[in-house]
């Protein structure tokens, strides 16, 4: 079955092409740390031959606590992104939270991301669609895979069909997430075979029901990522940090930066194997 290709500059993203890595850090903690992390990703992905898009947030507008670190903000964040692009020649993905942010952010980065908690906000979707940028839509934890076609349709009505879908798990009772591996193929089907990627970092989140910060299951990142890659996906979304225990956001779910290369070697091996299989139709 023909898969839709979404191009991010010279990077082609599709379910039947070699996977693209969307990776970086959760939130911009400082200019120097962003440079350090981006440089490591670029070095490793170039060594392994993996297409790469750098990810970071300039503002975490949905933190659980009012006291949690949010990021440097729009103006300073765009300056850091511009320096990363000029220094390393990378493509960049970041999220927006308000309609007014869509165009200023799209003027700097290559992919703008619709956060899971905001994925049904029509005003935000319309503003993002109007930019003409490539869009990454995070599937809300409370939305079934089959409902994602409605969000894609909103973007199409807004004149933008350059949409990537991203799964980051589904609510499983209170304060826990699980990933339905059958959901990936459903998302492909309802979106006209749009590229589907897997955010393994945020799928590992779990919470202290009375705490102010998210916990995580970093020790299981490789096994969950291997399971997702075995489905046959357009890309993998992963956040890493040189010192996860002291990261300012989602450290418990972050991959230790030093483990990036061996982790990606495993992901590439699985992706190469799965996409070397002949398509098998078991529906009839």
Curated annotation (Swiss-Prot):
Organism phylogeny: Bacteria, Pseudomonadati, Pseudomonadota, Gammaproteobacteria, Enterobacterales
Gene Ontology biological-process annotations: keto-3-deoxy-D-manno-octulosonic acid biosynthetic process
Enzymatic class: transferase
InterPro entries with a match to the protein in the record: Aldolase_TIM, DAHP1/KDSA, KDO8P_synthase
Protein's recorded name: 2-dehydro-3-deoxyphosphooctonate aldolase
Family: Belongs to the KdsA family.
Cellular-component GO terms for this entry: cytoplasm
Record keywords, A-Z: Cytoplasm, Lipopolysaccharide biosynthesis, Transferase
Catalytic activity line of the entry: D-arabinose 5-phosphate + phosphoenolpyruvate + H2O = 3-deoxy-alpha-D-manno-2-octulosonate-8-phosphate + phosphate
Pathway: Carbohydrate biosynthesis; 3-deoxy-D-manno-octulosonate biosynthesis; 3-deoxy-D-manno-octulosonate from D-ribulose 5-phosphate: step 2/3; Bacterial outer membrane biogenesis; lipopolysaccharide biosynthesis
NCBIfam families reported for this sequence: KDO8P_synth, PRK05198.1, PRK12457.1
Entry EC number(s): 2.5.1.55
One GO molecular-function entry: 3-deoxy-8-phosphooctulonate synthase activity
Domain of life: Bacteria
Taxonomic source organism: Escherichia coli O157:H7
Subcellular location: Cytoplasm
């Amino acid at each position: 079955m023909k898969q839709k290709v979404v191009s991010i500059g010279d990077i082609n993203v599709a379910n039947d092409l070699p996977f693209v890595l969307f990776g970086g850090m959760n939130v911009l903690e400082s200019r120097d740390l962003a440079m350090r992390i981006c440089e490591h990703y670029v070095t490793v992905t170039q060594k392994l031959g993996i297409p790469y898009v750098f990810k970071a947030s300039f503002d975490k507008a949905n933190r659980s606590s009012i006291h949690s670190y949010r990021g440097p903000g729009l103006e300073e964040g765009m300056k850091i992104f511009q320096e990363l692009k000029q220094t390393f020649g990378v493509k960049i993905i970041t999220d927006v939270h308000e309609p007014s942010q869509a165009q200023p952010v799209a003027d700097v980065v290559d992919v703008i991301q619709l956060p899971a908690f905001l994925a049904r906000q029509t005003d935000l979707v319309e503003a993002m669609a109007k930019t003409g940028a490539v869009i990454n839509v995070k599937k809300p934890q409370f939305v079934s895979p089959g409902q994602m076609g409605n969000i894609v349709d909103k973007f199409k009505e807004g004149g933008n069909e350059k949409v990537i879908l991203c799964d980051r798990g589904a609510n499983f009772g209170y304060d826990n997430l699980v990933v339905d591996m059958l959901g990936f193929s459903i998302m492909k089907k309802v979106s006209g075979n749009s590229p589907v990627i897997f955010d393994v970092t945020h799928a590992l989140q779990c919470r202290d029901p009375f705490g102010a910060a998210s916990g995580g299951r970093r020790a299981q990142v490789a096994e969950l990522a291997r399971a997702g890659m075995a489905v046959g996906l357009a890309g993998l979304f992963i956040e890493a940090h040189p010192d996860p225990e002291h990261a300012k956001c989602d450290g418990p779910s972050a991959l230790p930066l030093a483990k990036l290369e061996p982790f990606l070697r495993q992901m590439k091996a699985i992706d190469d194997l799965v996409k070397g299989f002949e398509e098998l139709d078991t529906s009839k």
